[in-house]
């Protein structure tokens, strides 16, 4: 099948890369976002020719900071023209047939005398099936079968690990590492001591000098297992260091192949910054290559066929949802707010990359709406708004009434009204799912968020650089993790009673860690550009202030060490045994955190969305996989 030709909207001409409208008129704002409930004439804020690289004087004489962000990459006309032949009506019957066939495979490897089962490798077969359906993004169809398989494997688990088959006395590294990872992620209690027996007399993981494919696969599974370590697990830290070095060396010696591509992907996108849909697309491509080389077994061929069908059916749904998102964005008047980053397509890519359940369209679309407003507020508080205007807006949000717009400057009125309407609309949606009013949760999160941003705006206006601790405490909130997570997860078809919500929302340890990691990671990617715009305070500058004589490299090393430590703590908060709060409830918030981290892999992938992020949009949303 031919590949879609992707034609992003070309960058618009601009004056010193300032906030220029699509008609090339130097206007920061042509009209407010919304006129709902208001009768007013829009008043534009026009940039004069008096500009520097980071400031501009508007025609009302106000000196404003600017972000110099590139324009929207995805034209609405292009989005509305998307089409796919892979809708459920065309491919749903084929998918159901394949689902039934894969369930039969699960059943046959679970039979004592089944044709696909052998006492020599039955445990590895169960683990491989579970791992494959999860990496291929089709596990939602097989939750019962997965539970049966993992219960079976766990019944043979021992303090010395397991071998590939229940009759194999000696444990092997590959099966033990894969089993450790899969079992821990599903809430089974496993301890890392199982890896001690694989060490040599020098305390290192024992392996031969010959890098066979089997040995490399074993070390790859060890690396994947090491990424879900808890803070106190020294052996897992050692395993990560060893396996990372081993795999990097292997990439230099083995030929380019599906195995080398799998290794490169896993090293590049560690579990905490991986998007499940990108992993699915990558793994499909890897298995397709193996299928071409005729190295796939019958079971995996069937899984691959189902994965391709499911990927493309969801791709059809993605394009329909993206049309709704783009239409909403266009009709809201947001394109006229030319001082903000327009990243609605990128936000949709994030959320559809972490949740591929077809029935959750409402969740995905409303997640984009929340993130869109987070971006508007971010750019307004970070750059465009004056400190007096921002204080007025913060007070208006606390008041939470349409009449609060009376005191706002004209360009803020539309922002406020649309924010007010959207948050209330989302609260009504959440009420349907949760059976109770959740507006107060949303308002509290929003007020805290704007309060943290106002504090940062005050730091900018006075040139104040806080202590590292003061900055990070505020940054956990201004990272927007809480506001981007709270309302969307309440619209899922998952109950979040108060006792569950308090384990993932503020002031829980889970929320604290997620916000901290996002702030720390974001600053390491953004501090140089932020500093060029006049934002001196960052984790890096605050650390250097607290530690006279330290360099930027010292600060980055310290912060990266903090991130690694906090990732392990977040692992524990997600996976720790808790009868009252199931892993499945926390996983939704955790996956949003993974998605947000993904966009800071190389740089600030939201602000600079015309490189890796653009490719991600194409690969996971716009293009189907070849059938």
Swiss-Prot record:
* Molecular-function annotations in GO: lyase activity; magnesium ion binding; terpene synthase activity
Q: Which reaction does it catalyse?
A: (2E)-geranyl diphosphate = (+)-car-3-ene + diphosphate
Q: How is the cofactor bound?
A: Binds 3 Mg(2+) or Mn(2+) ions per subunit.
Main location per the UniProt record: plastid
> Has UniProt tagged this entry with the keyword Metal-binding?
yes
Instruction: List the keywords (alphabetical).
Output: Chloroplast, Lyase, Magnesium, Manganese, Metal-binding, Plastid, Transit peptide
User: EC number(s) per UniProt?
Assistant: 4.2.3.107
Question: Binding residues for Mg(2+) 1, per the UniProt record?
Answer: 378, 382
GO cellular component, alphabetical, reads: chloroplast
Record-listed Mg(2+) 3 binding positions: 530
Pfam families xrefs? Terpene_synth, Terpene_synth_C
GO biological process terms on file? diterpenoid biosynthetic process; monoterpene biosynthetic process
Q: Where is this motif: DDXXD motif?
A: 378-382
List cofactor names only: Mg(2+); Mn(2+)
Mark the transmembrane ranges. Answer: none
| Taxonomic superkingdom | Eukaryota
Q: Does the keyword rRNA-binding apply?
A: no
Q: Which InterPro entries does the UniProt entry name for this protein?
A: Isoprenoid_synthase_dom_sf, Terpene_cyclase-like_1_C, Terpene_cyclase_plant_C1, Terpene_synth_N, Terpene_synth_N_sf, Terpene_synthase-like, Terpene_synthase_metal-bd, Terpenoid_cyclase/PrenylTrfase
Query: Transit peptide positions?
Result: 1-36
Family annotation (CDD domains): Terpene_cyclase_plant_C1 (cd00684)
- Chain positions recorded as Mg(2+) 2 binding sites: 378, 382
Which pathway is it part of? Terpene metabolism; oleoresin biosynthesis
* Cell compartments where the protein resides: Plastid, Chloroplast
Task: Please state which protein family the record places this protein in.
Answer: Belongs to the terpene synthase family. Tpsd subfamily.
What function does the entry list?
Terpene synthase (TPS) involved in defensive oleoresin formation in conifers in response to insect attack or other injury.
- Protein's recorded name: Carene synthase, chloroplastic
Record lineage? Eukaryota, Viridiplantae, Streptophyta, Embryophyta, Tracheophyta
Gene designation per UniProt: 3CAR
